[in-house]
Protein backbone atom coordinates (compact mmCIF):
# COMPACT_ATOMS: atom_id res chain seq x y z
CA UNK A 1 0.00 0.00 0.00
CA UNK A 2 1.26 3.51 -0.79
CA UNK A 3 1.67 5.61 2.34
CA UNK A 4 3.05 9.08 3.02
CA UNK A 5 5.20 10.58 5.74
CA UNK A 6 6.69 14.08 5.98
CA UNK A 7 10.19 14.51 7.39
CA UNK A 8 12.47 17.44 8.12
CA UNK A 9 16.16 17.42 8.91
CA UNK A 10 17.95 20.50 7.69
CA UNK A 11 18.09 21.57 4.07
CA UNK A 12 15.53 19.58 2.11
CA UNK A 13 17.76 19.15 -0.95
CA UNK A 14 19.89 16.42 0.63
CA UNK A 15 16.99 14.72 2.39
CA UNK A 16 15.13 14.43 -0.91
CA UNK A 17 18.17 13.14 -2.82
CA UNK A 18 18.86 10.57 -0.10
CA UNK A 19 15.33 9.17 0.07
CA UNK A 20 14.97 9.11 -3.72
CA UNK A 21 17.59 6.34 -3.67
CA UNK A 22 15.75 4.13 -1.16
CA UNK A 23 14.00 1.08 -2.64
CA UNK A 24 10.29 1.36 -1.98
CA UNK A 25 10.19 5.16 -2.04
CA UNK A 26 7.96 5.98 -5.00
CA UNK A 27 7.93 9.77 -4.96
CA UNK A 28 9.29 12.73 -3.03
CA UNK A 29 8.49 16.41 -3.12
CA UNK A 30 10.04 19.23 -1.10
CA UNK A 31 8.05 21.94 0.60
CA UNK A 32 7.35 23.91 3.73
CA UNK A 33 5.25 22.54 6.59
CA UNK A 34 3.86 23.36 10.02
CA UNK A 35 3.84 27.11 9.44
CA UNK A 36 1.35 29.92 9.84
CA UNK A 37 1.49 31.51 6.36
CA UNK A 38 -0.40 30.12 3.37
CA UNK A 39 1.87 29.30 0.40
CA UNK A 40 5.03 31.00 1.69
CA UNK A 41 7.97 31.71 -0.56
CA UNK A 42 11.45 30.44 0.21
CA UNK A 43 12.44 34.00 1.07
CA UNK A 44 9.60 34.26 3.60
CA UNK A 45 10.51 30.93 5.20
CA UNK A 46 14.14 32.08 5.54
CA UNK A 47 13.04 35.06 7.65
CA UNK A 48 12.08 32.55 10.39
CA UNK A 49 8.81 34.43 10.94
CA UNK A 50 6.46 31.91 9.28
CA UNK A 51 7.28 28.95 11.60
CA UNK A 52 7.67 26.68 8.56
CA UNK A 53 10.28 23.96 8.35
CA UNK A 54 11.87 22.65 5.16
CA UNK A 55 10.16 19.29 4.74
CA UNK A 56 10.16 16.35 2.34
CA UNK A 57 6.98 14.45 1.58
CA UNK A 58 7.87 10.80 1.07
CA UNK A 59 5.38 8.51 -0.66
CA UNK A 60 6.43 4.91 -0.13
CA UNK A 61 5.20 1.39 -0.74
CA UNK A 62 5.10 -0.32 2.63
CA UNK A 63 5.48 -3.73 0.95
CA UNK A 64 9.08 -2.75 0.15
CA UNK A 65 10.09 -0.27 2.84
CA UNK A 66 8.64 0.14 6.31
CA UNK A 67 8.04 3.32 8.24
CA UNK A 68 10.58 2.05 10.79
CA UNK A 69 13.16 1.73 8.01
CA UNK A 70 12.47 5.30 6.87
CA UNK A 71 12.86 6.52 10.46
CA UNK A 72 16.16 4.61 10.84
CA UNK A 73 17.43 6.23 7.66
CA UNK A 74 16.44 9.70 8.87
CA UNK A 75 18.03 9.09 12.26
CA UNK A 76 21.36 8.14 10.66
CA UNK A 77 21.60 11.14 8.32
CA UNK A 78 20.78 13.93 10.76
CA UNK A 79 22.11 15.00 14.12
CA UNK A 80 19.06 14.08 16.20
CA UNK A 81 20.37 16.08 19.19
CA UNK A 82 20.68 19.39 17.34
CA UNK A 83 18.02 22.09 17.68
CA UNK A 84 17.38 24.24 14.60
CA UNK A 85 20.66 23.22 12.96
CA UNK A 86 21.92 20.53 10.60
CA UNK A 87 25.37 20.82 9.06
CA UNK A 88 26.01 24.44 8.11
CA UNK A 89 22.29 25.21 8.02
CA UNK A 90 21.06 27.19 11.04
CA UNK A 91 17.57 28.49 11.78
CA UNK A 92 14.16 27.25 12.84
CA UNK A 93 13.35 26.36 9.23
CA UNK A 94 16.05 23.66 9.51
CA UNK A 95 14.64 21.98 12.61
CA UNK A 96 14.17 18.22 12.58
CA UNK A 97 10.70 16.77 12.55
CA UNK A 98 8.47 13.88 11.60
CA UNK A 99 4.94 14.74 10.56
CA UNK A 100 2.15 12.24 10.02
CA UNK A 101 -1.51 12.06 8.99
CA UNK A 102 -2.18 8.42 9.90
CA UNK A 103 -2.86 7.98 13.63
CA UNK A 104 -1.20 4.52 13.56
CA UNK A 105 2.01 6.19 12.36
CA UNK A 106 2.05 8.42 15.44
CA UNK A 107 2.43 5.40 17.72
CA UNK A 108 5.18 3.89 15.54
CA UNK A 109 7.11 7.18 15.42
CA UNK A 110 6.85 7.89 19.15
CA UNK A 111 7.79 4.31 20.05
CA UNK A 112 10.80 4.47 17.71
CA UNK A 113 12.04 7.73 19.23
CA UNK A 114 11.44 6.52 22.79
CA UNK A 115 13.63 3.48 22.13
CA UNK A 116 16.33 5.74 20.67
CA UNK A 117 16.04 8.14 23.63
CA UNK A 118 16.50 5.24 26.06
CA UNK A 119 19.87 4.51 24.42
CA UNK A 120 21.40 7.92 25.14
CA UNK A 121 21.54 10.56 27.89
CA UNK A 122 21.35 13.35 25.28
CA UNK A 123 17.92 14.80 24.50
CA UNK A 124 16.57 13.97 21.05
CA UNK A 125 15.38 17.19 19.39
CA UNK A 126 13.13 15.75 16.66
CA UNK A 127 9.62 17.15 16.86
CA UNK A 128 6.71 14.80 16.18
CA UNK A 129 3.42 16.35 15.15
CA UNK A 130 0.35 15.71 13.09
CA UNK A 131 0.87 17.37 9.70
CA UNK A 132 -0.93 20.71 9.88
CA UNK A 133 -0.04 21.95 6.41
CA UNK A 134 2.37 21.33 3.57
CA UNK A 135 3.09 23.81 0.80
CA UNK A 136 5.08 22.55 -2.17
CA UNK A 137 8.30 24.53 -2.62
CA UNK A 138 9.25 26.39 -5.76
CA UNK A 139 10.13 24.26 -8.79
CA UNK A 140 13.83 25.16 -8.65
CA UNK A 141 14.05 23.40 -5.26
CA UNK A 142 12.57 20.13 -6.58
CA UNK A 143 15.28 17.49 -7.21
CA UNK A 144 17.78 20.33 -6.70
CA UNK A 145 20.83 18.10 -6.28
CA UNK A 146 19.99 16.22 -9.49
CA UNK A 147 20.05 19.53 -11.35
CA UNK A 148 23.04 20.92 -9.38
CA UNK A 149 25.13 17.89 -8.36
CA UNK A 150 28.07 19.89 -6.98
CA UNK A 151 25.95 21.95 -4.59
CA UNK A 152 26.27 21.92 -0.81
CA UNK A 153 24.65 18.98 0.97
CA UNK A 154 24.86 18.15 4.69
CA UNK A 155 23.68 14.56 4.10
CA UNK A 156 26.10 11.68 3.55
CA UNK A 157 24.35 10.23 0.51
CA UNK A 158 26.45 7.03 0.61
CA UNK A 159 24.57 5.94 3.75
CA UNK A 160 21.48 5.17 1.66
CA UNK A 161 23.03 1.82 0.77
CA UNK A 162 22.51 0.57 4.33
CA UNK A 163 19.42 -1.58 4.76
CA UNK A 164 17.09 -1.49 7.74
CA UNK A 165 14.36 -4.04 8.35
From Swiss-Prot:
Gene3D superfamilies xref list: Peptide methionine sulphoxide reductase MsrA (3.30.1060.10)
Catalysed reactions, as listed in the record: L-methionyl-[protein] + [thioredoxin]-disulfide + H2O = L-methionyl-(S)-S-oxide-[protein] + [thioredoxin]-dithiol; [thioredoxin]-disulfide + L-methionine + H2O = L-methionine (S)-S-oxide + [thioredoxin]-dithiol
Gene Ontology biological process terms, A to Z: cellular response to oxidative stress; protein modification process
The keyword ATP-binding belongs to this UniProt entry's keyword annotation: no
List of catalytic residues: 11
Keyword Protein transport: no
Name of a matching Pfam family: PMSR
Role noted for this protein: Has an important function as a repair enzyme for proteins that have been inactivated by oxidation. Catalyzes the reversible oxidation-reduction of methionine sulfoxide in proteins to methionine.
Keyword annotations from UniProtKB, A to Z: Oxidoreductase
Gene Ontology terms: cellular component: cytoplasm
Domain of life: Bacteria
Gene behind the chain: msrA
UniProt xrefs under InterPro entries: Met_Sox_Rdtase_MsrA_dom, Met_Sox_Rdtase_MsrA_sf, MsrA_MetSO_reductase
Family: Belongs to the MsrA Met sulfoxide reductase family.
SUPFAM superfamilies membership: Peptide methionine sulfoxide reductase
Protein name: Peptide methionine sulfoxide reductase MsrA
Molecular function terms, GO-annotated: L-methionine-(S)-S-oxide reductase activity; peptide-methionine (S)-S-oxide reductase activity
EC number: 1.8.4.11
Amino acid sequence: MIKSIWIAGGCFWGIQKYFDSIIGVNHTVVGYSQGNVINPSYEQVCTQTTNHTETVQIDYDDRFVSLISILEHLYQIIDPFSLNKQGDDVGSQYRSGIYYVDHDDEFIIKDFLLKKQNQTPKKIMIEVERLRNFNIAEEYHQKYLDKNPNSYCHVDLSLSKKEFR
